[in-house]
Regions:
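Alpha-helical transmembrane segments of multi-pass membrane transport proteins
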Residues: 1-429
C-alpha cells in the first residue's frame, strides 16, 4: 500500500507544498490506514516526542552562533582573510568564495546560511570583477554544500540522534570529506579560469598583509577549534559545545571586535529562533512520519527489496548513492535522514559498512542534493540573493555538481577518507 504513496509524496513536494504539511498529511493518512486514526492525540504526541531530545538542543544554539557571527561582521573578516590568501590566483574571487564557505562551515553548519551570507557579499563583487552573474551564483550554491559537512553540522546531529551514533565521531568524520569537496571545486575553478580568462582580484599579498588579515580573522577562526577541541578533550558534550559557541560568538561580537551592539541581540535571537523552529518542526514531523511508516512494516519490505537487488555491497552502495542524490533534490536532508536512515543504515552495517562511514555517505549525498536541479533549496536561495533565474543557475552549476558527484564516490569506496580521524582519536571503533 505504501508504495503507491511515494509518487504522490514526490508530486506534492515538486509543486511546492511545504515539507512539514506533506509529512503530516501522510502521517494522518497512514495512521488511519493502520486503524489508529481515532487517536487524535497521537499526532502532537509524536511531534513532541520527536524533538524532546537533549542532543537536538545543539541545533538552535549553533543557529544562534551562526547568526551572531554573521550580524557581527564576521563574514566580511573571513572574506578578507580568504582574499589575502587566494585573491592573487586566476579566478581569485571564485577561489575566495569556496575558501570562505569552508571557513564559514565551521561557524554555521548550514548551506542556506552560507549561500545567503556569502552570496550577498561576493556575488555582486564577482559581477563587478567581470564574472557572469550565473557563474557567481552557481559557485556560491555549489560551495555552500560544504556547510553541513564540515563540523559543526546540524544534519549530523540529527543523524546521531536518530541512529544512536556519536556526534563527535560524525563531526570528525566530516572534516576530510568537507575539505575534499572544497579542494575539488578549487581545482575545477583553476581549469575554468584558464579557459574563460577569469581575473585575479589583487596582486600577490605580502606575508605582512596575510598576517594582518589572519589577526582580524583570528577570533572567528577559533570557533571551530574551541568546538572540536572541547569535544575531543572531553571538556564538554557536543550539545554543550553549541552553547559555548553561541556564548563565544556573543562575547567576541560585543566586547572583543565590538562589531555587535546590545540592541541587535533581540533581532539576532528572534531570527535564530525562527530558523531553528522551521528545522525542529521538520524534525518533529519526520519523526512522526517515521513512527507510522514503521507500523506499516515498510522498512522490512524495503530492506528485503534492496538486499534482493544484489549481495555485493559495492553495487548496492552505487545504487543507494543515486537514490540519495535524487531524494536530496526534493526532500530536505533532516527529514530524509530521519525517514531513510533507520531503513538503510542497518542494511549496510550488515553488509560490512561502518555505521559512521555510511552516515557520511548519506549526509554528503543529501547535502549535495540541496544544490541539485530542479528543486535544490540553495538554488532558490542563490537566485533570491543574485536576482538570476533558477534555470540559468541550474545550467551553470552542472560542472561543479559533476565534480562533487565524483567526490561522493571517492568517499563511498575509500572509507579511509572519512574514517581515519575518528578511528585515530578513538571516537569510532
Amino acid at each position: 500500500m505504501l508504495i503507491w504513496f511515494l509518487p504522490l509524496f514526490l508530486l506534492f513536494l515538486m509543486i511546492g507544498l511545504p515539507v512539514f504539511f506533506v509529512l503530516l498529511a501522510f502521517f494522518g493518512i497512514l495512521l488511519w490506514l493502520n486503524d489508529q486514526g481515532r487517536d487524535g492525540a497521537m499526532l502532537y504526541r509524536n511531534i513532541y516526542n520527536g524533538i524532546d531530545s537533549f542532543p537536538l538542543m545543539a541545533i538552535p544554539f549553533f543557529m544562534l552562533a551562526g547568526e551572531l557571527m554573521n550580524r557581527g561582521g564576521i563574514t566580511l573578516r573571513l572574506v578578507e582573510f580568504s582574499q589575502a590568501m587566494m585573491g592573487h590566483l586566476k579566478g581569485g574571487l571564485a577561489h575566495v568564495n569556496v575558501l570562505t564557505s569552508m571557513l564559514f562551515a565551521g561557524l554555521s553548519g548550514s548551506a542556506v546560511a552560507d549561500t545567503s551570507a556569502i552570496g550577498s557579499m561576493l556575488i555582486p563583487a564577482m559581477e563587478k570583477q567581470g564574472y557572469t552573474k550565473k557563474f557567481a551564483a552557481a559557485i556560491t550554491a555549489a560551495s555552500s554544500v560544504i556547510g553541513p559537512i564540515i563540523p559543526p553540522s546540524g544534519i549530523m546531529i540529527i543523524y546521531a540522534y536518530v541512529m544512536g551514533e556519536s556526534v563527535a565521531a560524525l563531526f570528525l568524520a566530516g572534516i576530510v570529506p568537507g575539505i575534499l569537496v572544497g579542494v575539488s571545486l578549487m581545482v575545477t575553478i583553476k581549469f575554468m579560469a584558464k579557459r574563460y580568462n577569469f581575473p585575479a582580484v589583487t596582486k600577490k599579498t605580502t606575508w605582512s598583509q596575510r598576517g594582518k588579515a589572519s589577526l582580524k580573522a583570528f577570533f572567528p577562526l577559533m570557533t571551530p577549534v574551541i568546538i572540536l577541541g572541547g569535544i575531543l578533550g572531553g571538556i564538554f558534550t557536543p550539545t554543550e559545545a553549541s552553547a559555548v559557541a553561541a556564548a563565544y560568538a556573543m562575547f567576541i561580537g560585543l566586547f572583543v571586535l565590538k562589531s555587535l551592539e546590545w540592541k541587535e541581540i533581540p533581532k539576532v535571537m528572534t531570527k535564530a529562533a525562527m530558523v531553528s523552529s522551521v528545522v525542529l518542526l521538520l524534525v518533529g514531523a519526520a519523526m512522526a512520519f517515521k513512527t507510522v511508516v514503521s507500523l506499516s512494516h515498510a522498512p522490512e519490505y524495503l530492506a528485503q527489496f534492496v538486499l534482493g537487488l544484489s549481495d555485493n555491497p559495492y553495487i548496492l552502495l552505487f545504487l543507494i548513492n543515486i537514490l540519495l542524490f535524487i531524494v536530496g533534490m526534493f526532500l530536505d536532508a533532516g527529514p530524509a535522514i530521519i525517514i531513510l536512515g533507520p531503513i538503510l543504515g542497518p542494511i549496510f552495517v550488515e553488509l560490512g559498512v561502518h555505521p559512521v562511514h555510511f552516515a557520511i555517505i548519506m549526509s554528503v549525498n543529501l547535502t549535495v542534493g540541496l544544490a541539485t536541479p530542479p528543486m535544490g533549496l540553495v538554488l532558490f536561495v542563490a537566485s533570491s540573493v543574485s536576482g538570476e533565474r533558477v534555470e540559468t543557475i541550474a545550467k551553470a552549476i552542472l560542472p561543479f555538481l559533476a565534480v562533487e558527484a565524483i567526490v561522493i564516490f571517492l568517499i563511498t569506496y575509500f572509507p579511509a577518507i572519512s574514517m581515519t580521524i575518528p578511528l585515530l582519536t578513538g571516537f569510532a571503533k
